[in-house]
Amino acid sequence: MYKVIFDSINSTQDEIIGFNNYKKILKNNNLYIQSFRQIKGTGRGKKKWSSPIGNIYLTINQKLKASYALRNNFYICYIIHKFFKINFNINLDYKWPNDLFLKNKKIAGVVVKSTILGKKSYLKTGIGININNSPIVDSVSLFGIINKKSNILDLSNIIIDFIEHSLTKKISNKKLVRYLNKYMIRDFKLNHPIFGKNIIEILSVNEDLSLKIKIDDTIKNIFFGELV
């Protein structure tokens, strides 16, 4: 494992080295890029992630089989959820496909960018976790839950070690999906390019990690879209 840390950067998902050297590093190691502040942090699609000093912003760079690329987003959410449960006795709620909430307020988000070359994928998994600040109205921080400020560098090192250890473990899709369904929030509307903005019934995450919904008395499986 390698880690690079910045005081400030546009985004931890930015390229900091040439792609050939990047591939060499990822041949045998994961690369973690962290910054205490992001100037242009991004979420899913064109969304911006407010990134003031006091929270954790990092990107995990990995080389995986191309077939694992889709799953990684969900697995990282699962790992972060487990971290909060084990270390703080906090059971977060899961919002498909890549956010974690507590009492309807967002505390963490995951966004993945991938480059697929043949059977290999190079993944940049961005993670934002509200630790000492909750930068938007509908968000919450760890400080807001436990009423205690955290040292960002110390806590991020603990989280990275937890993630790195967890990534060495095998977990079946069945177990992952069962876990996600257990904690999934189901009271969102759908914003989707095909189905539009409709009131839906969220049923479950399928084993292929699509979302099963009910719309106009019809069951649909969607692989992308936004819950709002």
Regions found by a protein language model. Name each.
Residues 1-86:
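N-terminal lobe of the biotin/lipoate ligase/transferase fold
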Residues 42-44, 95, 220:
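Basic side chains
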Residues 31, 91-95:
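A short coil-to-beta-strand element that immediately follows conserved catalytic motifs
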Residues 3-5, 14, 24, 65-68, ...:
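Long, positively charged amphipathic alpha-helical accessory segments at protein N-termini or as interdomain linkers
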